[in-house]
């Protein structure tokens, strides 16, 4: 039950964010979107370092001076995997007018949902890897540290849910359909978590590779998507400030509770 709840927490964050469409009349302003993107980026960077990369290196200490190698390899596989998906799946980043990936007749909103869904899969995988390590009795991964990662991702999923549902509403969709669109982007997280949990449990010795793979994928999303989002438009430091806030929140949660 503990693992099930941990896997579902990030999805709940997305759903609560998407529910903003029922309480807010106007679409999110540019300043708010930049603040939310900065906050999400800060959370993801801190989670990648403290919850994923550091445990991956610690678990490979038996390799001596080469203890960095599994983390290095897994990290690069994660980056290259996201790069491949970027080229294979048509998608549109929030605040951008230029679609990426192969040419497609998909609508703007659909491609925006695909962009968020793409990195939600990876966030689900990160949670799945953490719980796989906990269930395997790994000394570096406790129930608290796995829960901290779930909570951190849920926190940054809240604005993502709103960033999807509010533009849908602004484009004329009904509140129910806009909410469903936001929720749909987060459904893949528990699915990705369960599949990764099962795969990681079958190959526990490769856990450092799985952890660093998730870190590489998450940092790719930060640089490719969130940093441009928090920096676009009229110059403002709001994105940078909220990046620092998100980073501090996740770092504090991980060190204090993990």
What positions do the PLM features span?
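Intrinsically disordered, metal-sensing/regulatory segments
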Residues: 1-258
């Amino acid at each position: 039950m503990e693992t099930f709840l941990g896997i579902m927490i990030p999805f709940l964050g997305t759903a609560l964010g998407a529910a903003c469409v029922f309480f807010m009349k106007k679409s999110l302003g540019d300043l708010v979107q930049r603040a939310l993107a900065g906050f999400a980026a800060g959370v993801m960077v801190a989670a990648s370092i403290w919850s994923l990369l550091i445990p991956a290196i610690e678990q490979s200490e038996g390799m001596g001076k080469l203890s960095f190698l599994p983390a290095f390899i897994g990290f690069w596989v994660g980056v290259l995997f996201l790069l491949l998906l970027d080229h294979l799946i048509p998608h549109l980043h929030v605040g951008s007018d230029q679609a990426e990936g192969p040419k497609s007749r998909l609508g703007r909103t659909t491609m925006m949902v695909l962009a968020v869904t793409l990195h939600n899969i990876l966030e689900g995988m990160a949670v799945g890897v953490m719980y796989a390590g906990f269930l395997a009795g790994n000394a570096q991964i406790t129930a608290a540290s796995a829960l901290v990662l779930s909570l951190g991702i849920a926190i940054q999923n809240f604005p993502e849910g709103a960033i999807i549902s509010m533009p849908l509403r602004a484009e004329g969709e009904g509140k129910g359909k806009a909410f469903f669109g936001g929720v749909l982007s987060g459904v893949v997280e528990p699915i990705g978590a369960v599949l990764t949990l099962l795969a990681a449990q079958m190959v526990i010795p490769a856990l450092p590779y799985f952890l660093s793979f998730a870190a590489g994928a998450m940092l790719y999303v930060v640089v490719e998507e969130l940093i441009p989002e928090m920096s676009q438009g009229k110059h403002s430091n709001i994105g940078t400030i909220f990046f620092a806030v998100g980073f501090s929140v996740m770092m504090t949660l991980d060190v204090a509770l993990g």
